[in-house]
Swiss-Prot record:
InterPro entries: PcG_RING_finger (IPR051507), RAWUL (IPR032443), Znf_RING (IPR001841), Znf_RING/FYVE/PHD (IPR013083), Znf_RING_CS (IPR017907). GO terms for biological process: regulation of transcription by RNA polymerase II. The gene is pcgf5b. Keywords: Metal-binding, Nucleus, Repressor, Transcription, Transcription regulation, Zinc, Zinc-finger. It comes from Danio rerio. One of its GO terms (molecular function) is zinc ion binding. The keyword Zinc applies. Residues 93-128 are annotated as: Disordered. This is Polycomb group RING finger protein 5-B. GO terms for cellular component: PcG protein complex; PRC1 complex. Pfam families: RAWUL, zf-C3HC4_2. The lineage of its organism: Eukaryota, Metazoa, Chordata, Craniata, Vertebrata.
């Protein structure tokens, strides 16, 4: 008769805890250069002051180590299944963070008109918001004189939207193509602070790693779009 050994959560701690904070991995994020994994917030904060992996010391990237990070959704699901109640606790903390962030930032004088515009948008389009944390975004058309396609890509009549923090740049591109009635083959670039964003980047990732690091930036986050430029 085969005997089955029971494993405790602590048997797996080496694989599911963060080297930086020593807690369970929250939004596990892997450094592609060395394959070490950390909490997303821990590694992003570490890279504000260093370009080296905090565990092995290897230089991740000379100028922008954030480009070498990849979320590990599979590991996140494994951790949530191993640790009872962790998913609910993390979701509650995340919801509270975004509610507090939006409340604090939108009280500023520069944001009052934007908030009114967002409310008008909601009245016109209905409330299709998901139950997960929301983020307000301003979508600005980036105009470059003489660029091909500038007559096709226009500014939106209602440029303020509210969406899930988990929405990706790819989804934003589809939204823009639909609103601007662009051909299915037409491609756009989406930028934050002048940097082209990858299609798999989420709004939360962009906010945390690009937008909030600029002290002069206010809420809501501004993303710019333009006809795609082929540098090849």
């Amino acid at each position: 008769m085969t005997s089955h050994r029971k494993h405790l959560v602590r048997d797996f701690n080496h694989f599911i805890t963060c080297f930086v904070c020593k807690g369970y991995l929250i939004k596990p994020t892997t450094v592609t250069e060395c394959l070490h994994t950390f909490c997303k917030s821990c590694i992003v904060q570490h890279f504000e002051d260093s370009n080296d992996c905090p565990k092995c010391g290897i230089q991740v990237h000379e100028t922008n180590p954030l480009e070498m990070l990849r979320l590990d959704n599979t590991l996140e699901e494994v951790i949530f299944k191993l640790v009872p109640g962790l998913r609910e606790k993390e979701q509650q903390q995340e919801d509270e963070f975004w509610r507090r962030k939006e409340s604090n930032d939108e009280n500023g004088p520069m944001c009052k008109k934007r908030r009114v515009d967002e409310e008008d948008d909601d009245k016109g389009d209905g409330d299709y918001h998901r139950s997960d944390p929301q983020i307000a975004i301003c979508l600005d058309c980036l105009r470059i004189n003489g660029q091909m396609g500038e007559n096709i890509v226009k500014g939106l009549m209602k440029k303020f939207i509210r969406c899930s923090t988990r929405v990706t740049v790819g989804t934003i591109k589809k939204f823009l193509s639909l609103k601007l009635k662009l051909p299915s083959s037409y491609e756009l670039d989406v930028l934050c602070n002048g940097e082209i964003m990858g299609k798999d980047h989420t709004m939360e990732f962009i906010y945390m790693t690009r937008w909030r690091l600029r002290g002069e930036n206010v809420y809501p986050m501004v993303l710019e779009y333009r006809p795609r430029i082929d540098f090849g």
